[in-house]
Amino acid sequence: DLTWETVITKNIGLDLGFLNNRLNVSFDAYIRDTKDMLMAGKTLPGVYGASSPRMNVADLRTKGWEASITWGDSFTLASKPFNYRVMAGIGDNTSKVTKYDNPNRTLTDPYEGQQLGEIWGYVVDGYFKTDEEARNYKVDQSFVNQMINASALDNGLHAGDLKFVDLDGNNKIEQTTSANDRKDMKVIGNSLPRYNYNFGISADWYGICLLYTSDAA
């Protein structure tokens, strides 16, 4: 049975005005919990021949903050009041999965503790300076040699090839499919922007209004 998603938001804010409210500063920090998110259920085995139906299966927590500063004033231009405002703002937020039925924490599905936008990958410790250093490298990275166009034979490594880090210490570079057993992979980045910026200018004079806004991330 499907139900409505529930959103619970907690926040604390501060608004300050200076110079007869010509200069205004505001700040807001928040935590937003989304319960019973509607999304696809766990990935089904291929023999089912169909994708998992959408269900209320996940909870998500978003933490963030926003800040802005605004300057507004007016003066007389050609015997008419000229009003203007300049505003700049910045914000940041991150979201983590707090509930999802994925005890094995497979990377093909959401898992508890996952930050949205996570990018998993290998860690590289520079490159081999000499052929001798490459030949003497004790870690078998034949699995990832295709990424650097190296041969699997005798590790196929030469000076200038990338040196992958053996994170689990078993002398072999391996791929993971689960956050419970990371093998030689880890979170190396995020596809979502951290900081969002906005800027705006508005003005009106003699019945003429102008507005400019821009956003960036």
Pin down the residues of each PLM region.
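Residue-level detector of the transmembrane beta-barrel scaffold of outer-membrane proteins
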Residues: 24-26, 66-68, 83-87, 200, ...
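Conserved small-residue
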Residues: 58, 65, 74-189
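Membrane-embedded beta-barrel scaffold of Gram-negative outer-membrane proteins
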Residues: 4-48, 91
